[in-house]
């Protein structure tokens, strides 16, 4: 048994920004009290990981990225009660401690124990469980899934159905839940409403699915890559528009298409100009615009405050507004009951050592979700 021992395994280490991943042998320490060591089976490639490589999301280096995954518990530290060795689990980049003001509120989901920003990039006790070539390696978002084994705090891991296919449900660890929940939980899209979704990547398509599940009558997909339109329509978009096809600003195009603007708009890209456009494209008085894409570090947004004065609501959504430890097992159960699909989001499945190819597919717009298998 490996319990209580250091495990040597393969991991994708990012030694510095704007460089490819390096597959290295790392040492993964055993879990301390209230920690869980997990063998990762499948992990998705998400734009947020690429944001660290590009410098949009500022993190310390060297680091093991990855936050959308599924695996099996290898061993647990002292005092862990919610999971046991052999359990199938999904790591949670938004933990749920159950004790902080946010966890105790019925409204929020961004547990105070999160390590998204500003990030320590370490375990909650301020230390790392990874070493490589004698150097401590940083964690990412309390998850670090681009490795055969990782260590998570018990508050950052959810036990799921033992029959769940891990190479599919790993998307519930980030991309799918983030988009689907932005529509259902954050915006609370109503039946018969009109929606616009800016950005039709994996998360944007999940927003489309959430709008459809909520009963929206019109769902307009907005993307500069028209190759994304067929899949968007397959998943529920009623119209798709490419801003490049128009000389006028996209919010004016959407206003003309809908009369007074959409009831709900979603920015799922992470660009300040599209955030402002999404706000301007929703109904002047009761429109709701939701920021889902990760905003770039150190950028400011300028917009006409009259857009809000007239009554619009502007809000953000992290992990789809779901309280993670409570909701992830339920979302997996819903998937098992075929209440939604994940297959159309997974365009590529690659062996783990091809991680750099997977990121190239993301950057060139050739993939929606690539899943890496160990």
From Swiss-Prot:
Cofactor binding annotation: Binds 2 Zn(2+) ions per subunit.
GO cellular component: cytosol
N-acetylserine PTM positions: 1
One GO BP: retinoic acid metabolic process
One of the record's GO molecular function terms: all-trans-retinol dehydrogenase (NAD+) activity
UniProt-annotated binding residues for Zn(2+) 2: 97, 100, 103, 111
Localization in the cell: Cytoplasm
UniProt keyword list: Acetylation, Cytoplasm, Metal-binding, NAD, Oxidoreductase, Zinc
Entry similarity comment: Belongs to the zinc-containing alcohol dehydrogenase family. Class-I subfamily.
Subunit structure: Homodimer.
Protein name, per record: Alcohol dehydrogenase 1
Organism: Struthio camelus (Common ostrich)
Gene: ADH1
